[in-house]
Protein backbone atom coordinates (compact mmCIF):
# COMPACT_ATOMS: atom_id res chain seq x y z
CA UNK A 1 0.00 0.00 0.00
CA UNK A 2 2.34 2.65 -1.20
CA UNK A 3 0.24 5.66 -2.19
CA UNK A 4 -1.64 8.17 -0.07
CA UNK A 5 -1.19 8.24 3.67
CA UNK A 6 -2.91 4.86 3.85
CA UNK A 7 -5.66 5.89 6.15
CA UNK A 8 -5.47 2.63 8.01
CA UNK A 9 -5.45 4.23 11.47
CA UNK A 10 -8.37 2.78 13.38
CA UNK A 11 -8.68 5.11 16.33
CA UNK A 12 -12.40 5.88 15.96
CA UNK A 13 -14.60 4.05 18.46
CA UNK A 14 -16.84 2.62 15.76
CA UNK A 15 -15.80 1.03 12.51
CA UNK A 16 -17.74 3.33 10.25
CA UNK A 17 -17.71 6.53 12.30
CA UNK A 18 -15.83 8.53 9.68
CA UNK A 19 -17.90 7.35 6.72
CA UNK A 20 -19.73 10.68 6.37
CA UNK A 21 -16.53 12.66 6.34
CA UNK A 22 -14.97 10.33 3.80
CA UNK A 23 -18.04 10.63 1.56
CA UNK A 24 -17.35 14.34 1.28
CA UNK A 25 -13.73 13.64 0.37
CA UNK A 26 -14.46 10.94 -2.19
CA UNK A 27 -14.72 12.41 -5.68
CA UNK A 28 -17.41 10.12 -7.00
CA UNK A 29 -17.17 11.60 -10.47
CA UNK A 30 -13.57 10.37 -10.70
CA UNK A 31 -14.24 6.87 -9.41
CA UNK A 32 -13.52 3.93 -11.68
CA UNK A 33 -16.90 2.32 -12.36
CA UNK A 34 -16.16 -0.54 -14.73
CA UNK A 35 -13.37 -2.90 -15.68
CA UNK A 36 -13.11 -0.93 -18.93
CA UNK A 37 -12.45 2.22 -16.90
CA UNK A 38 -9.58 0.38 -15.24
CA UNK A 39 -8.18 -0.71 -18.59
CA UNK A 40 -8.52 2.83 -19.98
CA UNK A 41 -6.83 4.34 -16.92
CA UNK A 42 -4.02 1.85 -16.45
CA UNK A 43 -3.73 0.21 -19.85
CA UNK A 44 -1.37 1.05 -22.73
CA UNK A 45 1.64 0.95 -20.41
CA UNK A 46 0.30 3.48 -17.88
CA UNK A 47 -0.04 0.83 -15.17
CA UNK A 48 3.44 -0.54 -15.76
CA UNK A 49 4.97 2.93 -15.82
CA UNK A 50 3.16 3.83 -12.59
CA UNK A 51 4.58 0.71 -10.91
CA UNK A 52 8.10 1.50 -12.13
CA UNK A 53 7.67 5.07 -10.93
CA UNK A 54 6.71 3.80 -7.49
CA UNK A 55 9.56 1.28 -7.40
CA UNK A 56 12.07 3.95 -8.42
CA UNK A 57 10.69 6.69 -6.17
CA UNK A 58 13.62 6.41 -3.77
CA UNK A 59 16.10 7.67 -6.39
CA UNK A 60 14.42 11.08 -6.90
CA UNK A 61 17.26 13.00 -5.29
CA UNK A 62 19.81 11.29 -7.52
CA UNK A 63 18.23 12.21 -10.85
CA UNK A 64 18.56 15.20 -13.11
CA UNK A 65 15.56 17.61 -12.96
CA UNK A 66 13.97 16.44 -16.27
CA UNK A 67 14.06 12.80 -15.19
CA UNK A 68 12.73 13.79 -11.76
CA UNK A 69 9.74 15.52 -13.36
CA UNK A 70 8.93 12.44 -15.44
CA UNK A 71 9.23 10.17 -12.42
CA UNK A 72 6.96 12.45 -10.39
CA UNK A 73 4.21 12.17 -13.00
CA UNK A 74 4.53 8.39 -13.02
CA UNK A 75 3.92 8.24 -9.28
CA UNK A 76 0.44 9.75 -9.52
CA UNK A 77 -2.12 7.71 -7.63
CA UNK A 78 -5.01 5.96 -9.36
CA UNK A 79 -8.63 7.06 -8.84
CA UNK A 80 -10.61 4.84 -6.47
CA UNK A 81 -13.03 2.20 -7.69
CA UNK A 82 -16.68 2.97 -7.29
CA UNK A 83 -18.36 1.05 -4.48
CA UNK A 84 -20.25 -1.00 -7.08
CA UNK A 85 -17.08 -2.01 -8.92
CA UNK A 86 -15.30 -2.98 -5.71
CA UNK A 87 -18.34 -5.01 -4.68
CA UNK A 88 -18.32 -6.82 -8.02
CA UNK A 89 -14.76 -7.99 -7.36
CA UNK A 90 -15.80 -9.32 -3.96
CA UNK A 91 -18.72 -11.17 -5.56
CA UNK A 92 -16.45 -12.72 -8.19
CA UNK A 93 -13.80 -13.74 -5.66
CA UNK A 94 -15.75 -14.60 -2.50
CA UNK A 95 -19.01 -15.76 -4.05
CA UNK A 96 -21.45 -13.20 -2.67
CA UNK A 97 -21.99 -9.48 -2.17
CA UNK A 98 -19.74 -7.97 0.51
CA UNK A 99 -22.78 -7.20 2.69
CA UNK A 100 -23.50 -10.94 2.75
CA UNK A 101 -19.91 -12.13 3.16
CA UNK A 102 -19.26 -9.71 6.02
CA UNK A 103 -21.42 -8.68 8.94
CA UNK A 104 -20.54 -5.07 8.15
CA UNK A 105 -18.87 -3.58 5.10
CA UNK A 106 -17.71 -0.01 4.50
CA UNK A 107 -18.38 0.69 0.80
CA UNK A 108 -15.87 3.55 0.74
CA UNK A 109 -12.15 2.78 0.62
CA UNK A 110 -10.03 3.73 3.61
CA UNK A 111 -6.72 3.41 1.74
CA UNK A 112 -5.18 3.24 -1.69
CA UNK A 113 -3.23 0.08 -2.43
CA UNK A 114 -1.25 0.71 -5.62
CA UNK A 115 -3.31 -1.61 -7.86
CA UNK A 116 -6.35 -1.73 -5.62
CA UNK A 117 -7.90 -0.27 -2.50
CA UNK A 118 -8.67 -1.24 1.08
CA UNK A 119 -12.07 -1.43 2.78
CA UNK A 120 -12.93 -1.86 6.44
CA UNK A 121 -15.26 -4.71 7.33
CA UNK A 122 -16.39 -6.91 10.22
CA UNK A 123 -16.47 -10.67 9.68
CA UNK A 124 -19.38 -12.93 10.56
CA UNK A 125 -17.65 -13.83 13.83
CA UNK A 126 -17.14 -10.17 14.76
CA UNK A 127 -13.50 -9.59 13.82
CA UNK A 128 -12.55 -6.19 12.39
CA UNK A 129 -10.62 -6.68 9.16
CA UNK A 130 -9.02 -4.81 6.28
CA UNK A 131 -10.08 -6.10 2.87
CA UNK A 132 -7.70 -5.31 0.02
CA UNK A 133 -9.52 -5.45 -3.34
CA UNK A 134 -7.63 -5.47 -6.64
CA UNK A 135 -8.81 -3.47 -9.66
CA UNK A 136 -10.59 -5.92 -12.00
CA UNK A 137 -8.48 -6.84 -15.00
CA UNK A 138 -5.46 -4.84 -13.87
CA UNK A 139 -3.25 -7.90 -13.38
CA UNK A 140 -3.85 -9.03 -16.95
CA UNK A 141 -3.41 -5.52 -18.33
CA UNK A 142 -0.10 -4.84 -16.62
CA UNK A 143 1.20 -8.36 -17.24
CA UNK A 144 0.59 -7.90 -20.96
CA UNK A 145 2.24 -4.49 -20.98
CA UNK A 146 5.35 -5.87 -19.29
CA UNK A 147 6.30 -7.23 -22.70
CA UNK A 148 7.12 -3.72 -23.92
CA UNK A 149 10.77 -3.93 -22.93
CA UNK A 150 11.85 -1.05 -25.16
CA UNK A 151 9.75 1.57 -23.37
CA UNK A 152 10.73 0.25 -19.93
CA UNK A 153 14.38 0.34 -20.97
CA UNK A 154 14.16 3.95 -22.16
CA UNK A 155 12.72 5.00 -18.80
CA UNK A 156 15.34 3.19 -16.74
CA UNK A 157 18.19 4.56 -18.86
CA UNK A 158 17.25 8.03 -17.60
CA UNK A 159 18.18 6.95 -14.09
CA UNK A 160 21.28 4.89 -14.88
CA UNK A 161 22.47 5.86 -18.38
CA UNK A 162 25.92 4.33 -17.89
CA UNK A 163 24.68 0.87 -16.98
CA UNK A 164 23.31 -2.10 -18.87
CA UNK A 165 19.75 -2.19 -17.58
CA UNK A 166 18.86 -5.64 -18.94
CA UNK A 167 19.11 -7.37 -15.56
CA UNK A 168 17.37 -4.42 -13.90
CA UNK A 169 14.45 -4.73 -16.32
CA UNK A 170 14.12 -8.46 -15.73
CA UNK A 171 14.10 -8.07 -11.96
CA UNK A 172 11.56 -5.25 -12.05
CA UNK A 173 9.31 -7.22 -14.39
CA UNK A 174 9.51 -10.27 -12.13
CA UNK A 175 8.78 -8.26 -8.98
CA UNK A 176 5.85 -6.45 -10.63
CA UNK A 177 4.37 -9.76 -11.79
CA UNK A 178 4.60 -11.05 -8.23
CA UNK A 179 2.97 -7.91 -6.85
CA UNK A 180 -0.03 -8.54 -9.11
CA UNK A 181 -0.55 -11.95 -7.47
CA UNK A 182 -2.46 -11.58 -4.20
CA UNK A 183 -2.05 -15.30 -3.49
CA UNK A 184 1.70 -14.80 -3.38
CA UNK A 185 1.33 -11.59 -1.38
CA UNK A 186 -0.83 -13.34 1.19
CA UNK A 187 1.76 -16.10 1.51
CA UNK A 188 4.50 -13.50 2.01
CA UNK A 189 2.43 -11.85 4.72
CA UNK A 190 1.84 -15.21 6.43
CA UNK A 191 5.58 -15.89 6.48
CA UNK A 192 6.38 -12.51 8.02
CA UNK A 193 3.50 -12.76 10.50
CA UNK A 194 4.63 -16.22 11.63
CA UNK A 195 8.26 -15.19 11.92
CA UNK A 196 7.55 -12.04 13.95
CA UNK A 197 4.77 -13.58 16.03
CA UNK A 198 5.28 -12.48 19.62
CA UNK A 199 7.99 -9.93 18.77
CA UNK A 200 8.10 -7.22 21.44
CA UNK A 201 7.68 -4.27 19.06
CA UNK A 202 7.18 -5.46 15.45
CA UNK A 203 3.77 -6.72 14.35
CA UNK A 204 2.41 -8.08 11.07
CA UNK A 205 -1.38 -8.51 10.69
CA UNK A 206 -2.49 -12.10 10.19
CA UNK A 207 -4.18 -13.10 6.94
CA UNK A 208 -7.74 -14.44 7.11
CA UNK A 209 -7.25 -17.40 4.78
CA UNK A 210 -10.89 -18.23 4.05
CA UNK A 211 -11.53 -14.63 2.91
CA UNK A 212 -8.46 -14.27 0.69
CA UNK A 213 -8.06 -15.11 -3.01
CA UNK A 214 -6.05 -14.10 -6.06
CA UNK A 215 -7.80 -10.68 -6.11
CA UNK A 216 -8.76 -10.12 -2.46
CA UNK A 217 -6.67 -10.22 0.72
CA UNK A 218 -8.41 -10.01 4.08
CA UNK A 219 -6.23 -9.31 7.12
CA UNK A 220 -6.60 -8.28 10.73
CA UNK A 221 -7.45 -4.58 10.91
CA UNK A 222 -4.43 -2.74 12.25
CA UNK A 223 -4.60 0.30 14.52
CA UNK A 224 -2.07 3.04 15.06
CA UNK A 225 -0.89 6.50 14.14
CA UNK A 226 0.14 7.35 10.62
CA UNK A 227 3.72 8.32 9.84
CA UNK A 228 2.80 11.99 9.44
CA UNK A 229 1.21 11.98 12.90
CA UNK A 230 4.10 10.15 14.50
CA UNK A 231 6.53 12.80 13.25
CA UNK A 232 5.00 15.10 15.88
CA UNK A 233 5.85 12.75 18.73
CA UNK A 234 8.82 13.33 21.06
CA UNK A 235 12.19 12.42 19.58
CA UNK A 236 12.58 9.55 22.03
CA UNK A 237 9.48 7.89 20.57
CA UNK A 238 10.70 8.49 17.04
CA UNK A 239 14.03 6.88 17.90
CA UNK A 240 12.25 3.82 19.27
CA UNK A 241 10.11 3.54 16.14
CA UNK A 242 13.23 3.81 14.00
CA UNK A 243 14.94 1.07 16.00
CA UNK A 244 11.99 -1.25 15.42
CA UNK A 245 11.99 -0.55 11.68
CA UNK A 246 15.74 -1.16 11.53
CA UNK A 247 15.52 -4.41 13.49
CA UNK A 248 12.56 -5.60 11.41
CA UNK A 249 14.42 -4.93 8.17
CA UNK A 250 17.60 -6.80 9.06
CA UNK A 251 16.00 -9.55 11.14
CA UNK A 252 13.96 -10.26 8.01
CA UNK A 253 17.06 -10.39 5.83
CA UNK A 254 19.22 -12.56 8.06
CA UNK A 255 16.43 -14.62 9.63
CA UNK A 256 13.84 -15.07 6.89
CA UNK A 257 16.29 -14.44 4.05
CA UNK A 258 13.68 -12.04 2.74
CA UNK A 259 13.21 -8.30 2.42
CA UNK A 260 9.92 -6.45 2.31
CA UNK A 261 10.83 -4.33 -0.67
CA UNK A 262 8.52 -1.38 -0.03
CA UNK A 263 9.93 0.73 2.83
CA UNK A 264 7.34 3.47 2.47
CA UNK A 265 5.90 5.71 5.24
CA UNK A 266 2.39 4.60 4.35
CA UNK A 267 3.24 0.99 5.13
CA UNK A 268 3.73 1.56 8.86
CA UNK A 269 1.39 2.23 11.77
CA UNK A 270 2.80 3.43 15.09
CA UNK A 271 2.02 3.18 18.77
CA UNK A 272 4.10 4.48 21.69
CA UNK A 273 7.07 2.52 22.95
CA UNK A 274 8.42 1.63 19.52
CA UNK A 275 5.39 -0.47 18.52
CA UNK A 276 5.19 -0.66 14.73
CA UNK A 277 2.75 -2.57 12.52
CA UNK A 278 4.08 -3.43 9.07
CA UNK A 279 1.67 -3.48 6.12
CA UNK A 280 1.78 -4.59 2.48
CA UNK A 281 3.88 -7.56 1.44
CA UNK A 282 3.30 -7.48 -2.30
CA UNK A 283 6.91 -6.60 -3.07
CA UNK A 284 9.06 -9.13 -1.21
CA UNK A 285 12.46 -10.32 -2.35
CA UNK A 286 13.57 -13.77 -1.17
CA UNK A 287 17.29 -14.55 -1.16
CA UNK A 288 18.96 -17.91 -1.55
CA UNK A 289 21.91 -18.68 0.77
CA UNK A 290 24.23 -18.17 -2.22
CA UNK A 291 22.74 -14.71 -2.86
CA UNK A 292 22.92 -13.74 0.79
CA UNK A 293 26.53 -14.78 1.34
CA UNK A 294 28.13 -11.87 -0.62
CA UNK A 295 26.14 -9.39 1.49
CA UNK A 296 27.40 -11.01 4.68
CA UNK A 297 30.94 -11.11 3.31
CA UNK A 298 30.90 -7.42 2.36
CA UNK A 299 29.85 -6.58 5.91
CA UNK A 300 32.74 -8.63 7.26
CA UNK A 301 35.23 -7.13 4.80
CA UNK A 302 34.43 -3.48 5.42
CA UNK A 303 33.06 -3.36 8.97
CA UNK A 304 34.78 -6.15 10.88
CA UNK A 305 38.02 -7.03 9.08
CA UNK A 306 38.58 -3.52 7.62
CA UNK A 307 40.04 -5.15 4.50
CA UNK A 308 39.43 -2.96 1.42
CA UNK A 309 41.07 -5.39 -1.00
CA UNK A 310 38.88 -8.25 0.21
CA UNK A 311 35.88 -5.92 -0.14
CA UNK A 312 36.84 -5.27 -3.75
CA UNK A 313 37.22 -8.97 -4.49
CA UNK A 314 33.79 -9.68 -3.01
CA UNK A 315 32.24 -6.92 -5.13
CA UNK A 316 33.84 -8.38 -8.24
CA UNK A 317 32.83 -11.97 -7.54
CA UNK A 318 29.23 -10.93 -6.80
CA UNK A 319 28.99 -8.90 -10.01
CA UNK A 320 28.77 -5.41 -8.49
CA UNK A 321 32.13 -4.34 -9.96
CA UNK A 322 33.68 -5.19 -13.31
CA UNK A 323 36.75 -7.38 -13.03
CA UNK A 324 39.99 -5.38 -13.29
CA UNK A 325 38.19 -2.03 -13.44
CA UNK A 326 40.83 0.73 -13.84
CA UNK A 327 39.90 2.47 -10.60
CA UNK A 328 41.60 2.41 -7.23
CA UNK A 329 40.33 0.31 -4.36
CA UNK A 330 40.21 3.48 -2.26
CA UNK A 331 37.85 5.11 -4.79
CA UNK A 332 35.63 2.03 -4.70
CA UNK A 333 35.44 2.06 -0.91
CA UNK A 334 34.72 5.79 -0.84
CA UNK A 335 31.94 5.39 -3.42
CA UNK A 336 30.18 2.56 -1.57
CA UNK A 337 30.95 3.70 1.96
CA UNK A 338 27.58 5.45 1.99
CA UNK A 339 25.96 2.11 2.78
CA UNK A 340 28.33 1.41 5.66
CA UNK A 341 28.97 4.83 7.23
CA UNK A 342 26.34 4.24 9.91
CA UNK A 343 27.75 0.86 10.98
CA UNK A 344 31.51 1.01 10.42
CA UNK A 345 32.21 2.33 13.91
CA UNK A 346 30.34 2.02 17.23
CA UNK A 347 28.64 4.94 18.94
CA UNK A 348 25.43 6.96 18.63
CA UNK A 349 24.78 8.49 15.22
CA UNK A 350 21.88 10.60 13.96
CA UNK A 351 20.56 9.93 10.46
CA UNK A 352 19.13 13.14 9.03
CA UNK A 353 17.11 13.79 5.88
CA UNK A 354 20.09 15.65 4.42
CA UNK A 355 22.28 12.62 5.04
CA UNK A 356 19.70 10.28 3.48
CA UNK A 357 19.50 12.49 0.38
CA UNK A 358 23.28 12.60 0.14
CA UNK A 359 23.37 8.79 0.12
CA UNK A 360 21.18 8.74 -2.99
CA UNK A 361 23.12 11.52 -4.70
CA UNK A 362 26.47 9.90 -4.01
CA UNK A 363 25.35 6.45 -5.09
CA UNK A 364 23.79 7.72 -8.33
CA UNK A 365 26.58 10.19 -9.09
CA UNK A 366 26.85 9.69 -12.84
CA UNK A 367 30.06 11.72 -12.94
CA UNK A 368 31.82 9.29 -10.64
CA UNK A 369 34.75 7.52 -12.33
CA UNK A 370 33.20 4.28 -11.08
CA UNK A 371 29.84 4.75 -12.81
CA UNK A 372 30.70 2.81 -15.96
CA UNK A 373 32.31 -0.04 -14.03
CA UNK A 374 29.61 -0.64 -11.43
CA UNK A 375 26.55 -2.83 -11.91
CA UNK A 376 23.57 -4.00 -9.89
CA UNK A 377 23.14 -7.76 -10.40
CA UNK A 378 19.55 -8.86 -10.94
CA UNK A 379 19.30 -10.54 -7.53
CA UNK A 380 20.14 -7.29 -5.74
CA UNK A 381 18.09 -4.71 -7.64
CA UNK A 382 15.39 -4.51 -4.96
CA UNK A 383 18.08 -4.49 -2.26
CA UNK A 384 19.08 -0.97 -3.31
CA UNK A 385 15.48 0.21 -3.08
CA UNK A 386 15.31 -1.19 0.44
CA UNK A 387 18.62 0.30 1.53
CA UNK A 388 17.91 3.74 0.15
CA UNK A 389 14.27 3.67 1.23
CA UNK A 390 15.30 2.72 4.76
CA UNK A 391 17.74 5.63 4.92
CA UNK A 392 14.96 7.96 3.75
CA UNK A 393 12.60 6.75 6.51
CA UNK A 394 15.25 7.00 9.24
CA UNK A 395 16.24 10.42 7.92
CA UNK A 396 12.69 11.74 8.19
CA UNK A 397 12.64 10.50 11.78
CA UNK A 398 16.03 12.15 12.53
CA UNK A 399 16.72 8.85 14.23
CA UNK A 400 19.61 8.44 16.65
CA UNK A 401 20.98 5.06 17.73
CA UNK A 402 24.17 3.05 17.96
CA UNK A 403 23.45 1.38 14.63
CA UNK A 404 26.68 -0.61 14.77
CA UNK A 405 25.82 -2.14 18.14
CA UNK A 406 22.30 -3.02 16.98
CA UNK A 407 23.71 -4.51 13.78
CA UNK A 408 26.16 -6.66 15.72
CA UNK A 409 23.20 -8.18 17.57
CA UNK A 410 21.74 -9.20 14.22
CA UNK A 411 24.77 -10.13 12.10
CA UNK A 412 24.95 -13.96 12.01
CA UNK A 413 28.75 -13.92 12.30
CA UNK A 414 28.68 -11.81 15.49
CA UNK A 415 25.40 -12.18 17.43
CA UNK A 416 26.52 -9.71 20.10
CA UNK A 417 24.62 -9.28 23.38
CA UNK A 418 21.70 -6.86 23.50
CA UNK A 419 22.74 -3.22 23.37
CA UNK A 420 19.37 -1.57 24.12
CA UNK A 421 16.26 -2.33 26.18
CA UNK A 422 14.50 -3.26 22.94
CA UNK A 423 17.37 -5.56 22.13
CA UNK A 424 16.98 -7.26 25.50
CA UNK A 425 13.26 -7.80 24.84
CA UNK A 426 14.08 -9.10 21.38
CA UNK A 427 16.65 -11.52 22.81
CA UNK A 428 13.94 -12.95 25.05
CA UNK A 429 11.66 -13.35 22.04
CA UNK A 430 14.40 -15.15 20.13
CA UNK A 431 15.11 -17.46 23.06
CA UNK A 432 11.44 -18.44 23.25
CA UNK A 433 11.24 -19.00 19.48
CA UNK A 434 14.73 -20.38 18.88
CA UNK A 435 13.63 -23.03 16.35
CA UNK A 436 12.00 -20.33 14.18
CA UNK A 437 13.60 -16.98 14.93
CA UNK A 438 17.17 -16.51 13.82
Question: Which functions belong to the PLM regions below?
Answer:
Residues 116-124:
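Conserved ATP phosphate-binding architecture of protein kinases
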Residues 261-265:
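Hydrophobic HxD+1 residue recognition
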Residues 99-110, 195-216, 402-410:
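Long, charged, glycine-rich C-terminal linkers/tails
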Residues 266-270:
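Hydrophobic residue at the +6 position relative to the catalytic HRD Asp in the kinase catalytic loop
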Residues 1-117, 143-165, 371, 401-402, ...:
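N-terminal accessory/targeting segments that precede structured cores
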Residues 17-22, 26-28, 32-33, 59, ...:
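Helix-rich C-lobe and terminal helical cap/extension of kinase-like folds
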Residues 132-134:
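Conserved beta3-strand ATP-binding lysine motif
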Residues 72-79, 91, 139-147, 152-259, ...:
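ATP-dependent phospho-/nucleotidyl transfer catalytic cores
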